[in-house]
Amino acid sequence: MVLRVAVVGGGPAGSSAAEILVKAGIETYLFERKLDNAKPCGGAIPLCMVDEFDLPPEIIDRRVRKMKMISPSNIEVNIGQTLKDDEYIGMCRREVLDGFLRERAEKLGTKVINGTVYKLDIPSKDSDPYTLHYADHSVGGTTGEMKILKVDVVIGADGANSRIAKAIDAGDYNYAIAFQERIRLPEDKMAYYDELAEMYVGDDVSPDFYAWVFPKYDHVAVGTGTMKVNKARIKDLQAGIRTRAAKKLEGGEIIKVEAHPIPEHPRPRRVVGRVALVGDAAGTVTKSSGEGIYFAAKSARMCAETIVATSNNGQRVPTEADLKQYIKQWDKRYGATYLVLDILQRVFYRTDATREAFVEMCSDIDVQKLTFDSYLYKTVVPANPLVQMKITAKTIGSLLRGNALAP
């Protein structure tokens, strides 16, 4: 037999899973409803992803080596002093990154289907296949032609509003809303953001997250995020970041407006039967930073590697217990990272006073090094005891001063 796997969702998660599966000789189908989709996304990727996922230089629009943190009272702190010459945060456009990864998987033998999966039939017997009902958009006009596909395993990589998650009753999660405008700036204004990204904090831009100005290929992404309880305020919060960054954005032209949900924690069930969720569908976005691209691709790769290993390169059908090995490995490897970022968000995004403290803390070289090393290489990097004591003292001092600094 040859194992058949359907991967639903053609973003970084889905394509990364498909690539691993097809290399192992597994019959792999990759569904993407919109092949030219420009998904709303800040577009930041860590340095480790470039090498780990073998991304070519042209995928990266900008190499950010400087970050400016801006407090509620508009105190600016420049960070990035600890970066080495060859270290940077990559900024990319999702339509470019997604297209590259999907095409690479297709060239290896993945069957890419331009289609929308509407329904997943769950088999009554463990030995029976899953049936996907989908609209094939390559034929049948705008609505597509309804078709079915039977497979042994399904990977749900179809984002925060995952239909696959609903089909397996994976449970819900709390989420944030991100709103972003792509703005094309005059040449002199764009030059300011050549290697620079900005993060703004304050109640005026987000009561529980942050706002950003990230450089792209020929424009900047200007956006903000907040928890779903505040989603009615999202346009007012966007106006807040536009006001805070107004002088730097003068003469800019809005070329695209985007919004999307950001999961705030993993779903209660990420594997049910022979269906596994990865990326945003599973809830792998980090708190504090809201980063999702790397963890989406990494979770999908780990899931696919588990399928390859437990199926003996596609010679047997893996069980639910087999697929759950991926979850155990994931939680063991990254659980500490998620915990630390959750604590940071709870402590420092609460009030303008704590946000002032957060920005002040970011001026410390030891804090910068710890933060960038953890972000660039996706590990919680332990500091030596003396440095840790210094950071702890700095944190307490900044929190105490925060009330005085807040506007």
Swiss-Prot record:
- Which key words tag this protein in UniProt? Chlorophyll biosynthesis, NADP, Oxidoreductase, Photosynthesis
**A GO term for molecular function:** geranylgeranyl reductase activity
Q: Which Gene3D superfamilies match?
A: FAD/NAD(P)-binding domain
Q: Which reaction does it catalyse?
A: phytyl diphosphate + 3 NADP(+) = geranylgeranyl diphosphate + 3 NADPH + 3 H(+)
Q: Which InterPro entries does the UniProt entry name for this protein?
A: BchP_ChlP_pln/prok (IPR010253), FAD-bd (IPR002938), FAD/NAD-bd_sf (IPR036188), Geranylgeranyl_Rdtase_fam (IPR011777), Geranylgeranyl_Rdtase_pln/cyn (IPR011774), Geranylgeranyl_reductase (IPR050407)
One Pfam family name from the record? FAD_binding_3
Note the coiled coil stretches, chain numbering: none
Please name the GO terms of the biological process aspect recorded for this protein, alphabetically: chlorophyll biosynthetic process; photosynthesis
Annotated pathway: Porphyrin-containing compound metabolism; chlorophyll biosynthesis
Class of enzymatic activity (EC top level): oxidoreductase
Per the UniProt entry, the Enzyme Commission number(s) are 1.3.1.83
Q: Which family does it belong to?
A: Belongs to the geranylgeranyl reductase family. ChlP subfamily.
What this chain does, per the entry, is described as: Catalyzes the stepwise hydrogenation of geranylgeraniol to phytol during chlorophyll A (ChlA) biosynthesis.
Which PANTHER family does the entry link to?
Answer: GERANYLGERANYL DIPHOSPHATE REDUCTASE, GERANYLGERANYL DIPHOSPHATE REDUCTASE, CHLOROPLASTIC
Identify this protein by name.
Geranylgeranyl diphosphate reductase
Q: Which organism is it from?
A: Synechocystis sp. (strain ATCC 27184 / PCC 6803 / Kazusa)
